[in-house]
Amino acid sequence: MKDGCTSQKVNKQRSIPLPVLKNPPAQKDEIRSSRSSWWRAAALITLTLLMIAHIIQWRLMGRTISPIEPSEAMYTLQNGAVNAGFIFFTLAILATLIFGRFVCGWGCHILALQDFCAWLLKKFGLTPKPFRSRLLVFVPLIVALYMFVYPTVYRYFAKPKNEPLIPQFTNHLVTSEFWATFPPVFVAIPFLFVCGFMTVYFLGQKGFCTYACPYGGFFSLADKVAPGKIRVTDACNQCGHCTATCTSNVLVHAEVKQYGMVVDPGCMKCMDCVSVCPNDALYFGFGKPAIGVPKTIKKNYSLTWTEEFAAAFVFLASFLAVWDVYQLVPMLMALGIATITTFLAMRTWRLFRVKDLSFYRFNLKSSGGIRQAGWIFLSFALVWLGLNAHSGFVRYHESAGARAFENIKIPDELALARTNPARWLSASDVQNINEGKKHLYTAVNASLLVNSTVLPKLAWIEYLSGNTEQAVNFLAAASEHQQGQAKALSFYYRGAILNRLGRYEQALTSLDQALAEQSDLVLAREERGESLWQLGRKQEAVSAWNDAVQSNDNLVLANNLLAGAAVSLGKSEAAAAYEKQADQFTPADPLFHWVVGLRLQNVGMNALAEKHFGRAIQLNPEFRKARN
């Protein structure tokens, strides 16, 4: 120790302890429950019950108000059939022009299913995350234009000059065929599952509304000019409760801050944001519409621009692959499937491109390695995408075969006049028969389900090819999977072919089945009379032909058959009257005369047959070659 330095004893500590106070419990910034959601749930449940009651009433009484479904408006625009769906859709658009897009939020059964699915997922701790795309949001509008505008535009350019743009309106408010425009029940159930549940799981709440609902395409446009909006007062403190509770995936807090109102056309006026606002700063009111307001809020999207174009391609390919495949998948279901396919394809792409990827609370990939959840997701995605590709393969061959079938020009009446119509087939017909057979057989052999419209086409192609037994078998198989008019026609064609083969008892059974399905099918009555005549039951045959004439006294063949029957039974005056009636409506067409002659010759009415053969040759001497 240096001289002069003395040790000093520190008597006090240099740091002073401060008293520690207990913190008060932190205030929980909880979002209060929405009172509006309960009212909306009640409205949607009531709507669902009314829909069920509507179906029950139709099943019990046989007649009811036509479906209150916007797609029914297509038949009004195309055929002039004014129905309940057209009236509802018109009123809904008009209401949206004033109040905004509230019909979707409070009056749509598909949205009710989506909300129910989201509620279930949250019960399992899974909160649907919105899939945001720049391009796919235009799908609903494009489809709406295709459904409701394109037919009128096409008619404008294609219609004859003397026809009106829109056909004369007729009253179709009441119908006995309530389900005629809907898919079968076994398709409707998976349709509701795909569009009401799966779209929510993969695309977020209201995923179907955002990317697949064509009616929403028009409602979104109407919402832009509607004065009714969710608006804000100065009491807003940007807590974000509104955005957190919005089930339409709208950035409510950001939009009301920037624009003073919600401008996103996806807002369905559910009123949840208004109900949960802690300061009661939000309200529904009228004022300036959203149109013309510059959109300055930058959104975060799920895809890059390169991925956007890839997603658009995948969506289109998937939609075309599944729409109407097996003659079962309706357009709206195809749109729902395509959105899910697009999500799975893009997420699978990312699974191989990025180091880390999650889906809900599951880690699909971490630090470059695919986890167990990732392999499960990948397996599901590959199965789903594989089924899409398979559907596309089947749909291509169905479509190609159908086009070839439609290009076969030989008239049915001529082909059915004899068992072997080969002599009447043109080179073009032969080519289309071969093309149709190739594509339709490929579709049938690859199909996972039965296409009840392909089988009758194959039956007709086989008949024209001379394979009558195969044609009969295909028509029998088709009838097992058909309903209504389609089933009746399969029974009719089967009966007609069996008549030509001389198997009259079987033909009679098939024709009776056709008439049981559709009692006004007069062609089946004509063929039924032929079966009875050939079986020796002549009075019953005359009765069948009389039934046909009573429904339409202009039937040339039926009147000729009655004339021939009257001659056979010794009733010359009646024969002359029937023949005169037939001649009155017989066109000066050689082919028509020839077909009538062949049909009369089939039942042994040779004198009348020769009369028509002679008239055909007189009109066109080339038919003389057919006698040789």
Describe every region a protein language model picked out.
Residues 464, 500, 534-535, 568-569, ...:
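Register position in tetratricopeptide repeats
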